[in-house]
């Protein structure tokens, strides 16, 4: 039969393991007219009315106390089977998920709610994409209502089971994805990144910490406005060996005018070294007032190779000692030492 179940051989097992709903009904089936006349001489050909007017078919009914309607769950409860039997002969057998049900409503008295009729129409599409129809007529309206309620309950159970199966499938997929660890895959060595790779010394770019940069810029601007003296400054000597090799985050100031001074014990001993006049002329970063002060305090030194010492003026010594004993110079010196300590004071030793 077109549209019948392909799992008819499992019907008996399903009936043994599931709850069965049963009703005594009247049954009718719609039979389509053939598309072409039959060549058999016994069959009477169709007239023009049947060929060219609706419904292009006829209803065949069976009204007997032996016709029964059954609703039974599938063995694995994936669907529900609806079957119509004439005695032990199966007339219709379908999954309810493949069927469309129509229940006409009627009202005998105006003002009262409508009630469903005793007849229910069922349609489905067969393998040839042709719509097939049959009708179920119950003995009472209450019996029809009971069938509809049972049908709704079964359909609701199918929807809940489908939703639960979908959730279980989703959980299974999520569990599989969580168990999968892409880091276990073998990555070619050429594609691996080695951020800790030692780079050549000449290609190293020091990294400045935000806090040190901010404090150093603030101290640099404050020191430029207060510094008025510099001792033993030689820009040709770069004293940054440890900052280059051991402390990559050490901050360097190549364009800063912060003076570099000797350790405090040398000032207390009164020892001071002074650069030559030619060296002072090569320092463009010093303030004009500071350069003028040093140029006026030191005598010109000769450029002869044999003459390496500069004669010291006693008045100049007393003037330097006077500057060293001044409170403003001591405050400036303490600020410079504090800056050196904050950016790493051990590199000057």
Swiss-Prot record:
Which first-to-last residue range defines the signal peptide?
none
- Keyword Cytoplasm part of the UniProt annotation: yes
Q: Does the keyword Nucleotide-binding apply?
A: no
Q: Where in the cell is it found?
A: Cytoplasm
How is loss of this gene reflected in the phenotype of the organism? Sterility. Chromosome paring defects during meiosis.
Which GO cellular component does the record give, naming just one?
cytoplasm
For biological process, the GO terms are: homologous chromosome pairing at meiosis
What domain of life is recorded for the organism? Eukaryota
* Variant or mutagenesis effect after changing residue 199 to K: No effect on meiosis
The impact of changing residue 223 to I is: No effect on meiosis
The protein's UniProt keywords, in alphabetical order, are:
Cytoplasm, Meiosis
- The primary location reported for this protein is cytoplasm
What's its job? Required for accurate chromosome segregation in meiosis. Required for pairing to occur between homologous chromosomes. Acts in early recombination steps and ensures pairing fidelity and proper repair of meiotic DNA double-strand-breaks. Regulates recombination and pairing of homologous chromosomes during meiotic prophase by controlling transport of RAD50 from cytoplasm to the nucleus. May affect pairing of the gene-rich fraction of the genome rather than preventing pairing between repetitive DNA elements.
Protein name, entry field = Protein POOR HOMOLOGOUS SYNAPSIS 1
Q: Which organism is it from?
A: Arabidopsis thaliana
- Report the gene name: PHS1
